[in-house]
């Protein structure tokens, strides 16, 4: 009985940390893949931070990566518009309200982050994150969900 209680108590700090976690670490390397395919954002978070790291060796101009949040229905059109915007604008169409949050492009070994208010996300809507570097979005994509 005592061992069962100790076993159960061992998980309490983990559960509490997960419940109050309002940031996530995301990375991508030269293989053009994020280290995660989904991110859960607690509705209780006033702000949420994405810490992004390019774990590869390729330069920003050669194969930069970033993290962009948008409604899933908008990602393909945003990716096309991003190619037109070019690398100087992080392959992000300037002042486009469909872009909900993003990090700048970074090259191998570099890190960046973005903080946003989860209140911009609506219940029942489908959201995705992707890399906006030219033509990366088709392989580098994941889902974002609001969770209780």
From Swiss-Prot:
Disulfide bonds join 22-45. InterPro entries: Azurin (IPR014068), BlueCu_1 (IPR000923), Cu-binding_ET (IPR050845), Cupredoxin (IPR008972). GO terms for cellular component: periplasmic space. It is found in: Periplasm. Pathway: One-carbon metabolism; methylamine degradation. SUPFAM superfamilies: Cupredoxins. Residues 19-148 form the Plastocyanin-like domain. It comes from the Bacteria. Transmembrane segments: none annotated. GO terms for molecular function: copper ion binding; electron transfer activity. Cu cation binds at residues 65, 131, 136, 140. Keywords: Copper, Disulfide bond, Electron transport, Metal-binding, Periplasm, Signal, Transport. Residues 1-18 form the signal peptide. Gene3D superfamilies: Cupredoxins - blue copper proteins (2.60.40.420). It holds the Pfam family Copper-bind. The keyword Ligase does not apply. Probable electron acceptor for methylamine dehydrogenase. PANTHER family: AURACYANIN-B (PTHR38439), OUTER MEMBRANE PROTEIN H.8 (PTHR38439:SF2). This is Azurin. It comes from Methylobacillus flagellatus (strain ATCC 51484 / DSM 6875 / VKM B-1610 / KT).
């Amino acid at each position: 009985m005592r061992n069962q209680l100790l076993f159960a108590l061992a998980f309490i700090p983990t559960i509490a940390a997960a419940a109050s976690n309002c940031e996530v670490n995301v990375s991508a390397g030269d293989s053009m893949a994020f280290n995660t395919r989904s991110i859960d954002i607690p509705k209780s978070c006033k702000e949420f931070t994405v810490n992004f790291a390019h774990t590869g060796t390729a330069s920003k101009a050669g194969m930069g990566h970033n993290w962009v949040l948008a409604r899933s229905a908008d990602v393909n059109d945003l990716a096309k518009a991003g190619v037109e915007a070019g690398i100087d604008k992080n392959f992000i169409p300037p002042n486009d309200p469909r872009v909900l949050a993003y990090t700048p492009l970074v090259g191998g070994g570099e890190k960046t982050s973005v903080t946003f208010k989860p209140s911009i996300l609506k219940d029942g809507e489908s959201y995705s994150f992707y890399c906006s570097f030219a033509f990366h979005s088709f392989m580098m994509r994941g889902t974002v969900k609001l969770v209780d």
